[in-house]
Amino acid sequence: MKISKYILSIFVALLVFTHSNAAEKWDMALAYGASNFHSANATEFAKNVSDKSGGKLTIVTHPGGSLYKGGEIFRAVRTGQAQIGERFMSALGKEDPLLEIDSQPFLASSYSDAMKLYKASKPLTISALEAL
């Protein structure tokens, strides 16, 4: 009986130790091709996460809709089919038209105007995203 408990405790310790040191891998769904700046930014983000986590978390990017097409990314992440994804906010306009505010033509004609629009719309945008 003592031997069984001893072996069981060693097994549990090994299991916990192995699990705590295991690197985690996430798949990141991207709608745009690898050379697009959205995908390039995501690739840089993935590299930074891996570096900053000491390799404990690796994000594998899947550009060009190879994991999920653009219109499917939000649902895939929301339902846990993908751990992470990138899609610009205005693509969620069917969920809430407010999320298209930064894509409306002539609403902001400079980076300064875009920042003002962002600051003015941020509280409502956060509420809209939280409601999804």
Each language-model region and where it sits:
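Beta->alpha turn/N-cap motifs
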Residues: 63, 70, 80-93, 120-121
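Sec/Tat signal peptide C-region and signal peptidase I cleavage site
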Residues: 16-22
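Short, polar/charged alpha-helical segment
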Residues: 35-60, 120-124
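Bacterial N-terminal signal peptides that target proteins for export
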Residues: 1-8
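Bacterial N-terminal signal peptides
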Residues: 8-16
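Contiguous mixed-secondary-structure segments that line small-molecule binding/active-site clefts
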Residues: 46-47, 88-132
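N-terminal, post-signal-peptide region of Sec/Tat-exported proteins
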Residues: 48-79
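Extracytoplasmic "Venus flytrap"
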Residues: 27-44, 64-69
